[in-house]
C-alpha cells in the first residue's frame, strides 16, 4: 500500500490558514450591521486584503513564545524576592517612581487591553482583528507582570497598596485615565491612531526607556526584567502603529484630513501625559539616566522628525504645535514637580527638594532655564523647610478641561506668565492649559464638557468629604503622613536609614542627595 507524505505547511501558509482563511463574508446579516462602527468616523477602506499583518503569529506560536518568556521572567522575580532585592536599590526615594508607574501606567495598560479587545471586534478585515486580539493579550500580560514585579516592594514600602482604587479617583491620575477614556470612547480607527500610532509608535520610547533605564541605574532588577520581557511585544506594537497609519492613508485620499486631525490631537494629548514621565526622570530617580530635554530631543525630535518626513508623501505634516514642545521641554518637568511638591498632601508618594548635586545636574542639563527660573524657587523652599516651615498648598489645583493636568504651565514665549485659555460653550466657561488643549475642545465640545474633573468633584462634595484631608483618607485610601507628604523624616525614610545603619539628618541636606546610600 502506497503512503503519501503530506507536505508540511510553511509558516506563511500556516499563518494564512489560521487567520485570514477563518474569516468569511456575511450573508444573512448586512455587513454594516455586523460591523456598525467601521464607517462611523468617515474612514474609507477599499480593500482589507492590502493590510500587512505586523504580528504574523498564530495563536499556538504566540502562546509558546510568551510561555518561554514567562518562565524566565518569574524565575528572576522569585530570585529578587528571596534575596531581598529591594535592599539593593540606590535609595528609598526611587520607590516613589515605582508608585507613580504602578498607579498611573499599569492601569493605563489594562485600559489598552480593554480598548483593543473592543475595537478588534469592529473591523471586517481579519488581519486587523487578529492584530488587535494579539495586542490585547500583550497588554493584559504587561499589567500582570508589572503588578507581580512590584508586589515585593509593597511588603516593604508605603503607597503601593491600592493602585486600582486610586486610579479612578486621585486627581493627578485622571491625566492617564482621561487619555485612555478619550481613546476608548472614540471610533475604532481613531483608537488605533491614538494608542497604536501616537503613543506606541511615536511616544512609547519616552515612556519605557526612561523607566527601564532608570530601574537599571538604580539597582531595580525586577523592573528591568519585566521591561526586557515586554520589549519584543512593544516592537510588534510599534509596527502595528505604523501599519495602521499607512494602511488608512493608502486606502483613500479622503482619509488624509481626518487622520491629520487625529495626529494633531493625540500627539498633544500624549505630550501632556508624558509630562509626568519627564518629571519622574528629572526629579524622582536618585541615579539619573538622562534629562527629559535630552530624551525628547533623541526620541521625538530626531526619530519623530524622520517619521513625519516619511509621511509627507501621503500629505501628512508634523503635528500642530510641535514647535511649542521644543520650547516646553526646557520647562515642563520643573513646573510639574513644583506643583506636586506643594500639593503632596493629596498624592500617594513622597516629594522632596533636590540636594545640591541634583540641582547642579539640573543646571547642567537645562543651562538656559533652570538657574534663571526654577533653582531660586527650590532653594527658597529648602530654606523654609530648614526653618520648620515646609511649604504645603492647602487647596487643590485648577485642572485643564482636556488633559486634566493642573493649569501650571507657562506661555511658550514668556516663562514668567501662566498659560491659561478659556472659552464659553452653551453658557458655561471652560479653562485650558494651552492652545493645543483648547483646540481639541473646540473640535469636540460635546465630549469634553462631560469630563469628570476630580478637583471640581471634590469641591462639589461628591467625594466623601469637602476638605482635602477627609477626601485623601476616605476616598483616595491614602494614609496621610505615611504614604504622602515630605520624604525627609517620613516613616519610609526612617526605615531605609535603619536598614542602612544611618542616622537621620535633622534638616534637608544642602550638599548631597537626600539620604543616598
UniProtKB/Swiss-Prot annotation:
Gene3D superfamilies: Ribonucleotide Reductase, subunit A. One of its GO terms (biological process) is phenol-containing compound catabolic process. The keyword Repeat does not apply. Coiled coil: none annotated. CDD domains: AAMH_A. InterPro entries: Ferritin-like_SF, Phenol_Hydrox, RNR-like, YHS_dom. Its cofactor is Fe(2+). Fe cation 1 binds at residues 109, 139, 142, 234. It catalyses: phenol + NADH + O2 + H(+) = catechol + NAD(+) + H2O. GO terms for molecular function: metal ion binding; phenol 2-monooxygenase activity. SUPFAM superfamilies: Ferritin-like. Disruption phenotype: Cells lacking this gene cannot grow on phenol. Pathway: Aromatic compound metabolism; phenol degradation. Its EC number is 1.14.13.244. Part of a multicomponent enzyme which catalyzes the degradation of phenol and some of its methylated derivatives. DmpL, DmpN and DmpO form the oxygenase component of the complex. Required for growth on phenol and for in vitro phenol hydroxylase activity. Belongs to the TmoA/XamoA family. The multicomponent enzyme phenol hydroxylase is formed by DmpL (P1 component), DmpM (P2 component), DmpN (P3 component), DmpO (P4 component) and DmpP (P5 component). The oxygenase component is a dimer composed of three subunits, DmpL, DmpN and DmpO (DmpLNO). DmpN interacts with the auxiliary protein DmpK (P0 component). This is Phenol 2-monooxygenase, oxygenase component DmpN. The gene is dmpN.
Amino acid at each position: 500500500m502506497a503512503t503519501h507524505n503530506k507536505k508540511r505547511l510553511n509558516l506563511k501558509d500556516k499563518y494564512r490558514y489560521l487567520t485570514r482563511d477563518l474569516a468569511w463574508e456575511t450573508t444573512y446579516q448586512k455587513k454594516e450591521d455586523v460591523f456598525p462602527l467601521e464607517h462611523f468616523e468617515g474612514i474609507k477602506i477599499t480593500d482589507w486584503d492590502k493590510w500587512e499583518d505586523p504580528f504574523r503569529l498564530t495563536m499556538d506560536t504566540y502562546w509558546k513564545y510568551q510561555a518561554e518568556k514567562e518562565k524566565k521572567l518569574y524565575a528572576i522575580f522569585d530570585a529578587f524576592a528571596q534575596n531581598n532585592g529591594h535592599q539593593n536599590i540606590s535609595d528609598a526615594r526611587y520607590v516613589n517612581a515605582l508608585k507613580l508607574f504602578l498607579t498611573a501606567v499599569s492601569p493605563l495598560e489594562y485600559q489598552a487591553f480593554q480598548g483593543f479587545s473592543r475595537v478588534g471586534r469592529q473591523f471586517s478585515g481579519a488581519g486587523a482583528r487578529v492584530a488587535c486580539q494579539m495586542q490585547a493579550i500583550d497588554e493584559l500580560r504587561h499589567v500582570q507582570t508589572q503588578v507581580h514585579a512590584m508586589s515585593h516592594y509593597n511588603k516593604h514600602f508605603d503607597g503601593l497598596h491600592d493602585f486600582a482604587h486610586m486610579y479612578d479617583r486621585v486627581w493627578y491620575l485622571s491625566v492617564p485615565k482621561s487619555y485612555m477614556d478619550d481613546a476608548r470612547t472614540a471610533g475604532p480607527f481613531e483608537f488605533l491612531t491614538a494608542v497604536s500610532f501616537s503613543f506606541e509608535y511615536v511616544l512609547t520610547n519616552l515612556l519605557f526607556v526612561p523607566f527601564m533605564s532608570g530601574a537599571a541605574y538604580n539597582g531595580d532588577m525586577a523592573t528591568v526584567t519585566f521591561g526586557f520581557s515586554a520589549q519584543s511585544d512593544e516592537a510588534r506594537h510599534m509596527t502595528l502603529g505604523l501599519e495602521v497609519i499607512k494602511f488608512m492613508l493608502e486606502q483613500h485620499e479622503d482619509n488624509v484630513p481626518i487622520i491629520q486631525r487625529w495626529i494633531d490631537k493625540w500627539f498633544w494629548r500624549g505630550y501632556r501625559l508624558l509630562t509626568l514621565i519627564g518629571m519622574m526622570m528629572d526629579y524622582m530617580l536618585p541615579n539619573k539616566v538622562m534629562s527629559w530635554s535630552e530624551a525628547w530631543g533623541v526620541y521625538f525630535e530626531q526619530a519623530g522628525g524622520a517619521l513625519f518626513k516619511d509621511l509627507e508623501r501621503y500629505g501628512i505634516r508634523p503635528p500642530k504645535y510641535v514647535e511649542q514642545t521644543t520650547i516646553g521641554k526646557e520647562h515642563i518637568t520643573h513646573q510639574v514637580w513644583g506643583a506636586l511638591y506643594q500639593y503632596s498632601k493629596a498624592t500617594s508618594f513622597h516629594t522632596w527638594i533636590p540636594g545640591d548635586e541634583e540641582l547642579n545636574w539640573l543646571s547642567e542639563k537645562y543651562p538656559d532655564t533652570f538657574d534663571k527660573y526654577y533653582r531660586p524657587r527650590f532653594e527658597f523652599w529648602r530654606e523654609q523647610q530648614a526653618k520648620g516651615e515646609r511649604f504645603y498648598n492647602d487647596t487643590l489645583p485648577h485642572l485643564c478641561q482636556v488633559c486634566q493636568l493642573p493649569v501650571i504651565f507657562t506661555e511658550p514665549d514668556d516663562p514668567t506668565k501662566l498659560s491659561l485659555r478659556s472659552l464659553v460653550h452653551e453658557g458655561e466657561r471652560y479653562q485650558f492649559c494651552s492652545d493645543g488643549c483648547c483646540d481639541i475642545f473646540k473640535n469636540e465640545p460635546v465630549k469634553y464638557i462631560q469630563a469628570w474633573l476630580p478637583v471640581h468633584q471634590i469641591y462639589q462634595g461628591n467625594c466623601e468629604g469637602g476638605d482635602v484631608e477627609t477626601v485623601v483618607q476616605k476616598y483616595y485610601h491614602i494614609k496621610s503622613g505615611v504614604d504622602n507628604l515630605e520624604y525627609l523624616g517620613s516613616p519610609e525614610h526612617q526605615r531605609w536609614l535603619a536598614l542602612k545603619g544611618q542616622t537621620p539628618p535633622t534638616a534637608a541636606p544642602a550638599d548631597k542627595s537626600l539620604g543616598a546610600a
